[in-house]
Amino acid sequence: MPIQNNLQKFNDLRKEYPVFVYDSYHYEIADNGNLVVSFSFFVGNAIRYNPIVYIKKHSLFDDFYTSGNLEKLQDFVFSIGMIELLSYWKSTCSPIIEVRCGSLDEEAVSFWKKLYFNGLGEFFYTNSIEISIDEMVTIVPQLFTSAKKHFFGLKDETIVPIGGGKDSVVTLEELRLAKPLIPLIINPRKATLETLKAAGMDGNFLEIQREIDPVLLELNAKGFLNGHTPFSAMLAFYSLLLGVLSGRKNIALSNESSANEATVAGTEINHQYSKSYEFEADFRRYVKRYLSDELNYYSFLRPLSELQIARLFSQYPQYFSVFKSCNAGSKQDIWCCNCSKCLFTFIILSPFIAPEKMREIFGENLFENPSLLYILQELCGLTAEKPFECVGTVDEVCVALAQTIKKYEKLPVLLQYFAKTELYTKYAAVDLNEQLRHFEPKHFLNELEINQLIDKINKLQR
């Protein structure tokens, strides 16, 4: 991720645009049965944003729509607006956010400030902006009160968001053995739809179509501030809304323990902050305090590492030809084979899938590409930063590389490089089977899920 010195631009924009306003939210059931959600944000007189989201019609929503409880969605939609606004606020980084709808108390304001600050850690870093959480923004609510919690009588069934990569495949396959579930997709693409087809679930899923206001894209083109925002936090709030609409209380994410590691060594800057245990714990407290005691948002894979997930995924060959984790190639539904996400995925799966099959999945053997050497060094912790992508820990990458070397008679160029480092000597001695049986204690799984996962990983062998 290129670092740009935009500190002066940051300061200038904050002076020119001192107040960002969250003016209103609106939702209604359209004639076609979709729930249409919209927000109104503005900055001064010149910049107005009106993003729109479509919750696609589904028969599971019928009971809620006929219950007369539509007004109970207000606090959920308001909260979605609080996370949606971040994509627009970051263009000007206005020092004040004025909230003219909904209600927030002091604890809620603290939650949002922490989420904004940590969720934008990468954004601030890559724009060379050094600022404290107190200096970043002041949130001024119109109503400084607590929201009212709601009861819906939700079923003990589960929504599983599907991203098209290996992690959500593992969650889907493991959870479907134990309880009824339904997949959720935001902005479906070929990989997500093909994943559901391979699972035999393509005829029944929940769908959200989210649109970015084109005004934001115009500002980006004009040189306003731009960068990473915490997508997984946005997904978290949308999944709550879908839980209420569908009458399901559980939302099972696929965020693993590896997401807790900082992206920049020696700091708390984490590309995956909104996938971390810290965010998950904060979010659950927010939901219980302000929205509903019934909803259970958690990550089913939290006790596991990327290495363990890769091993589990290797047991589902029906997904090999359809899963895609490459952001650069997502629109074309390809592995670009030239980015950190592609190389990481190739590395983490290689101990468990034969080289010939890996070449078939990716279209080439990425270990043979010398132009990926610097990315390899980033993934191995040989640089100050890991890639700003959803990748595993340095330890996991090094263990996977050391194990993969044992599978080759003639080493490709990237494995040759790693074999000559001190890292190889260190990680070649690691017991892979012991790594595969580790169970991270910080999680929110119930006892049945704990036993299910422990039983599964105890049976894992290379």
Residue ranges and their predicted role:
Residues 1-157, 174-215, 224, 247:
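RNA-binding accessory domains that recognize and position tRNA/RNA substrates
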Residues 2-39, 46, 289, 293, ...:
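ATP/NTP-dependent adenylation/nucleotidyl-transfer catalytic domains that generate, transfer
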Residues 61, 187-321, 331:
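ATP-dependent adenylate-handling ligase core
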Residues 87-99, 243-251, 350-360, 405-411:
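Short helix-capping/linker segments at secondary-structure and domain boundaries
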Residues 157-162, 170-172:
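Core alpha-helical transmembrane segments of integral membrane proteins
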Residues 167:
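Hydrophobic/small residue at the entry helix of a nucleotide-binding pocket
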Residues 170, 234, 238, 340-347:
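Short amphipathic alpha-helical face segments that pack within enzyme cores
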